[in-house]
Amino acid sequence: MGANDGIVSTAGLVVGVAAASTDVPAILTAGFAGLSAGAVSMALGEYVSVSAQRDTERAMLRTERRELEQMPEAELEELTGLLQRKGLEPDTARAAAKELTERNALAAHAEVELGIHPDDLANPWAAALSSAVSFTIGALIPLLVVVLPPEHLRIPPVTFVAVLVALA
């Protein structure tokens, strides 16, 4: 998704500047400014989003940990029921729930009940970097199209074709 944002926003920016001026350095300056702003914006947005997700997951794990400490038998019954809903026979579900709880109760409940793994929570820094890199790669396509073809083909034919191909 970040790559598409980079393609579309940067293409719009360079086409707009190119419509006002054929000065390649001015077009590139505007394009790189848009690329930089867009990459930072995408990274910050992704960081905030994934941080909120991780905070929610941590809160859910704290609740689950507390429930396991305060009412272990009820939690074992809950896990048994969840495993039965996944298709296990009652005796098999009870045995599996008991074994999973003995190995790592929090991990078992988190995975089956919450769909998360306590040791594999979302990483906001990795998500931010990935988003910034995606946007940058997408934004480079229209920038290269401004520089590489002969001047009379830059805007609009080659730019629009390149954007359409990149989005396809």
What residue ranges belong to the model's regions?
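Transmembrane alpha-helical segments of integral membrane proteins
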Residues: I141-P142, P157-A168
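Transmembrane alpha-helical segments and their cytosolic interface motifs
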Residues: M1-V14, P118-L144
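Hydrophobic alpha-helical transmembrane segments
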Residues: I27-F32, A128-A132, P156-V161
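Residue-level recognition of pore/gate-forming positions within transmembrane alpha-helices
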Residues: G34, F135, V163-L167
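Alpha-helical transmembrane segments and their lipid-water interface positions
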Residues: V8, G12-L13, S41-Q53, A107-E111, ...
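Selected alpha-helical membrane-embedding segments in polytopic membrane proteins
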Residues: V24, A30-D55, E99
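Cytosol/matrix-facing amphipathic helices and coiled-coil assembly/linker segments
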Residues: N4, V50-A132
